[in-house]
Amino acid sequence: ISSPVSXLTIHPLRNIMDMLYVGXITI
């Protein structure tokens, strides 16, 4: 996964989904 900033700029929805996915695994 590239830097969160670039991912957020290029694919905001994709970045949010990744954050939720990773957050679910972490929690």
UniProtKB/Swiss-Prot annotation:
Span of the signal peptide: none
Keyword Glycoprotein: yes
Disulfide topology: none
UniProt tissue specificity: Placenta.
Gene Ontology biological process terms in this record: proteolysis
Documented EC number(s): 3.4.23.-
Keywords recorded for this protein, A-Z: Aspartyl protease, Glycoprotein, Hydrolase, Protease
Superkingdom, natural source: Eukaryota
PTM comment, free text: Glycosylated.
GO MF terms, alphabetically ordered: aspartic-type endopeptidase activity
Family: Belongs to the peptidase A1 family.
Name of the protein in question: Pregnancy-associated glycoprotein 55
